[in-house]
Amino acid sequence: MRKFLLTVFSICTAGMAFGQSKLDLQSQLELYKLRNTAIPTYNSRTRAFERPKSVPENTMAMVEMKDQNDRADLEAQGVKVLRVRGNIAIVVAPIKDIERISALKCVRRMELPRRVYQKMDVVRKEIGVDKIHQGVDLPQAYTGKGVVTGIVDGGIDPNHINFLKPDGSTRFGYISKITASQSNKDGYQFDNYYPRAVLDTLTNRDNAYAIEDFTTDSYTTFHGTHTTGIMAGGYKGNITYAKTNDNDKSYKVTGPNPFYGCATESELVASCGDLRDQYIAFGVDDVVQYAQLSGKKPKPCVINLSLGSNIGVHDSTSVMNRFLAEEGKHAIICVAAGNEANMGIALKKDFAAAGETVKTFLTPMQPDSLSSGGKTYYNLRNGQIAAYSNDSTAFDLQIVVTNTKRGNKAAVRIPLQNNTKGQPITYASGGDYSMSGAVINQTFAKAFDGYVTAASMIDPETGRYYAMAQIMTSDNQKDNKDGNYKLALEIKSKKPGQRVEVYSDAQFIYFDSNKQEGFVSGTRNGSISDMACAANIVTVGSYNVRNHWSSLDGFVYGYNKRGDEDDFPEGEASRFSSFGTLADGRNLPHVCAPGASIISSVNTYAVENPDLGYSDMALQGKLEKGGKKYYWHQSLGTSMATPVVAGAIALWLEANPSLTVKDVVRIIQQTARKDNFVTNTGDPVQWGAGKFDAYAGLKQVLKEKETNGINGVRYAESQEVPVITMTGERSFSAFLAGAKQLNLRAYSLSGQLVHSLSAQGDELNVNASSWNKGVYLIQVNGGKAQRIVIY
């Protein structure tokens, strides 16, 4: 996941109607930003803070309708409906009418865009893809033929030689590009790209262009070209690349490209541009529609999302996550777990009594100075935090300015002691941060330049009370140059047994005790991306396969200095790989795959951008052919691990196009390798089922297909633990390999039996729509109970 500065959310209360419960707090913060031109926001394309010239007329949004037939009602109210999946619509709506639209009877919930962040030679051998390509002990070789491999990402160079057929024609069937646009009345620009041969046949060519003429959507990142190359890069011709014999000096060789990907002959589809969740949803639907409609019959499809955001309730209930779950019925969607486990960005507290308090410091991830857009920030704290109660019970939340020299005594308290129903409470330093409705506090200004705003409400979907805070502070260099004033978070419980979960967006803030008495640090468990918590997806973590690499400048580089402790020991889970135990009882990710570090193709236009300063030191391979230069580069992250799994799943889909996401997850879990690293190092939750094994998984796919196992008999000889899978917010399935009958009992947390069901066979699908909301313990055939949450 690439790190970018978060947009500075401004606070403008004029004209706002608070308490619109169908708009979540994050959407309300986004609405403030869209309506305010006074405070600059960070533009990741220009890498500078810029002031909007005007308030946009429209914005994209996601609407969860009460009924699938409510589309006409939305359109009658001036809403432009772009796509619908299930009862969720992607729409364009006037910014001035957002509150009115969200209050319509046909609307259950409405969410505005949130920003998300970008989260092979050794790899193919490690997971068995080389054996699959060679057809070792298989009926044939598999390369992804007939399968659509889709990706939604930024920094895509579709004409990289890694994505061309041997005859030089493109492997891409379609590309969409979606970018924010002030000049477009809808607030975004949507462009379509087709192979030239297809484009020439189109009668309507509005905003349609040739893929062969596409350069890139971004000149500042290589991310999408890298992930696509891992998933499906297919160039096997000669390149110049670096090798080493002593892990000290490197030398150049010319030979067959060792850095191609997994699904080398699959059909490629991409959506690129600005990284906002609704643009991503639109892009996912583009890929699904292409797979369903571009051939005589629907094509099997896998989609890679090396993207995410840590802000959210971390379950399957957000509108975005429900949309992904709907799309997951038509394609296998793989989502990166996130790269935030190396810092405590989650905080979970079970309170034993009312009035109990937990305190932590909001600690800058990048201490000292940071220059951006011609301005320097000191100990920058910029981003969002969100705190969730386990039910409707409120809690007291305060953002506190503390004074280290006075024993961390509170200098300023920004209180959020009651449900504000979405109305923000804002403290600011004044000057550049003079905002309508804000409290200009002199002590706050003495400590920081910037602002803090917080609001709270009850989530109408889950019934949980939650609060959010938006923060941007830079240490005042006149009165706080030594950093004695710090920012802290305090939460006080309202009843015994209350549980509160707090998440940072992981961009510039984490939770730390600073080794101060009475303060606690955050936890790594909970660092999982919110988007990775959707139902009907595959969530992927990372483990290490390489911690050094040969570069074209003649040297070998790595993440560890000589004599230092090994930060990325080969075989272990990557320390950054995010994970979490969710409120509904699930542990994520499902599995880990090689993610540190991976060499793959990169965006030529980013490498040749002089502002980025690429040199042979940063490159592991290159080729000049036909007047264009192509490059290969190493990178690491769950962003790299996820397309490893997505590309391998494409090989499985070639073998059996009828695989569902449920089949895929089950086979992944059954065939994952549990070596000594998995069993003896790291956190068990972080590992998921273990190390992804593409080869063993494909053999299982073929075995089940041969005996009608997919969607029929389940093979899980070694699996004795029942698998409980949430299939919706109010439905789940239970599977126990080899069972002839299932007896399922659901208990309350107090141990009272509340539901009892039975069925013949090894699988039971449960419709819990009539159950009361809450946490249940599910016991299958007298075994160990597992926890689920019914919303």
Language-model-derived ranges and their functions:
Residues 49-51, 251, 294, 300-302, ...:
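C-terminal subdomain of the subtilisin-like protease fold in secreted/lumenal serine endopeptidases
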Residues 136-279, 298, 328-330, 344-345, ...:
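Subtilisin-like serine protease catalytic core
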Residues 266, 288-315, 336, 488-495, ...:
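Short acidic, glycine-rich surface-loop motifs adjacent to enzyme active sites
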Residues 773-791:
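C-terminal tail/sorting-segment detector
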Residues 228, 236, 269-274, 285-301, ...:
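Hydrolase catalytic cores
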Residues 5-6, 17-140, 148, 369:
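Autoinhibitory N-terminal propeptides
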Residues 28-55, 118-168, 205-222, 371-372, ...:
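N-terminal domain-start motif of subtilase-like serine proteases
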Residues 156-229, 237-250, 261, 408-509, ...:
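Active-site core segment of subtilase-fold serine proteases
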